[in-house]
C-alpha cells in the first residue's frame, strides 16, 4: 500500500477532500497538512522531511480563488526537499489538484526537487468535490513510479498477462461494481496483514477509510493491545 502526505489550503475543506481522494485511491495517509493547522513553517518543513512518503497530494483553492496558501504549501515542500521511501534514483512525485490559476506558481515554487503531475481541481467550487481525477492519478503513479522501485516487481510484471492492481483499488472496484449492478448501498471490510480497510458505496458515492495500524500479521500486536488477551 502506498503511503502519502496530503496538503490543502484549509483543513476542513480542501485538506479533507485531499485526504478522501488519497484514501479512496488505496493510500495510507501519513499526515494532513493545512495552512491553518497551527504549525509554524519550520515545523511543517521538518514534518515533510521526516515522513518519506511515496508521494504527496497537494490541493488548495477553488478555481479562480486565492493562490497564496497553496503556493506557501508548495514552498514548504520544496524547502523540505523530501526523499521517497523506495528508490534513490528518482524524484518524489507530487500531484497538484488545486486551483487551476495557481498551477504555474506551484510549479515554480516546487522547482526541480520533485516531479510534478497536474490534474483537475478536487474542490473546484466550495460546494463541489471532484475526487475522481486525483484518485486515478494516485493509482497510476503508484503502479508506474512506486511499485517499479519495489524488489521483484519488474519480474512480476513479466509474469502477469493482465494489469496489476493494488489490493485496495481492486477491493474498492469490486464494492463499486456490486453496488452498481445490484442498485444497492454496499459496505465491505478488508482485513489485511498491516491495515484494515472499510469500503462503502452509499447513494452512488464511494468512500474508503483505513486503519493503518490494525491487521492480522504485521500489525497483530496492535490488535492484541487494543483487544486484550481475553
Model-based region annotation:
Residues 1-185:
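Nucleotide/phosphate-binding catalytic cleft detector across ATP-hydrolyzing
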Residues 176-230:
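Glycine-rich phosphate-binding loop of actin/hexokinase-like ATP-binding domains
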Amino acid at each position: 500500500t502506498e503511503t502519502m502526505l496530503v496538503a490543502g489550503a484549509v483543513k476542513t475543506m480542501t485538506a479533507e477532500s485531499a485526504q478522501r481522494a488519497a484514501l479512496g485511491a488505496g493510500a495510507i495517509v501519513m499526515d494532513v497538512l493545512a495552512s491553518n493547522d497551527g504549525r509554524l513553517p519550520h515545523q511543517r518543513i521538518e514534518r515533510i522531511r521526516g515522513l518519506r512518503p511515496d508521494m504527496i497530494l497537494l490541493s488548495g483553492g477553488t478555481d479562480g480563488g486565492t493562490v497564496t496558501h497553496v503556493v506557501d504549501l508548495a514552498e514548504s515542500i520544496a524547502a523540505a526537499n523530501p526523499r521517497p521511501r523506495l528508490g534513490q534514483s528518482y524524484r518524489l512525485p507530487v500531484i497538484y489538484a488545486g486551483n487551476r490559476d495557481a498551477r504555474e506558481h506551484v510549479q515554480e515554487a516546487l522547482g526541480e526537487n520533485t516531479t510534478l503531475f497536474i490534474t483537475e481541481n478536487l474542490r473546484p467550487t466550495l460546494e463541489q468535490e471532484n475526487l475522481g481525477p486525483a484518485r486515478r492519478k494516485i493509482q497510476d503513479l503508484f503502479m508506474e513510479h512506486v511499485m517499479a522501485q519495489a524488489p521483484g516487481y519488474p519480474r512480476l510484471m513479466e509474469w502477469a498477462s493482465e494489469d496489476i492492481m493494488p489490493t485496495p483499488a481492486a477491493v474498492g472496484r469490486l464494492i463499486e461494481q456490486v453496488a452498481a449492478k445490484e442498485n444497492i448501498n454496499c459496505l465491505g471490510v478488508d482485513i489485511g496483514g498491516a491495515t484494515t480497510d472499510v469500503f462503502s458505496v452509499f447513494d452512488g458515492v464511494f468512500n474508503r477509510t483505513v486503519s493503518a495500524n490494525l491487521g492480522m500479521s504485521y500489525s497483530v500486536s496492535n490488535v492484541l493491545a487494543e483487544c486484550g488477551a481475553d
